[in-house]
Amino acid sequence: RDRSVSRGLGDVYKRQAVLDGPEAGYKVTYTQADAEAVTAEDGRVILMDEHLADSDAMDYDMDRADGEWALSDYVQKGIEVLDNGTGFFMMCEGGKIDWACHGNDPATVFEEVVDMDNAIKVAYEFYKKHPKETLIVVTADHETGGLGLGTGKYELQLKALAKQKQSQDILSRSITDLRKMRKVINWPEMKEFLAEKMGFRK
């Protein structure tokens, strides 16, 4: 049995890139440093993200380490490599907006939407240089989690979400790690933990 299949689709894609990429004429990069060094002269390139999180996806923007590439960096590099005299097509997906909505994690959702917006801004800067020959389409295939905006009053305290320091996924992992270290955790300790990670009142 192919172990890469059991570990998730991300491993399958990585394996295909490693085995099939060079054979098909693609240069494959495995580190961010190598990706940063890629130029249009390199021709056809597959950039593998070395900082993959759960299910082999990019980290949530909220969880991204300093210096780690955001979606906008990939768009910028894509434009640098693809920009030529004959034109090009690029598709960019802010796919983890959907993931955060599935987890009903609004603070992370907002951060992901801003991350996507930053990627669009990069594309828009390119558009301003080539307005007569550039089309940018921004769309969504579905909504998840019941997120909506209306004209009535809300009880949701959005400012409180700004205190959240990590995604629900990382929070769950942190709690699991805490329980592995200590079988019994009292409520004052948990309150301290939640205050640090999520901005809850002590």
Stretches with model-predicted labels:
Residues 2-13:
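Single conserved hydrophobic/aromatic residue that forms the stacking wall/gate
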Residues 166-202:
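Active-site neighborhoods of enzymes that stabilize oxyanions during catalysis
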Residues 115-157:
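Metal-dependent active-site segment of extracytoplasmic phospho-/sulfohydrolases and closely related
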Residues 23-27, 41-45, 83-89, 130-135:
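Loop/turn elements at helix/coil->beta-strand transitions in domains of secreted/extracellular proteins
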Residues 52-65, 83-87, 91-119:
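Active-site His/acidic residue clusters
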Residues 15, 112, 152-174:
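Acidic, Ser/Thr-rich peripheral helices and adjacent loops at domain boundaries
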Residues 7, 29-30, 46-49, 88-93, ...:
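Structural recognition of the beta-strand scaffold that forms the well-ordered cores
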Residues 11, 34-36, 52-55, 94-99, ...:
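Solvent-exposed loop/turn segments at secondary-structure junctions
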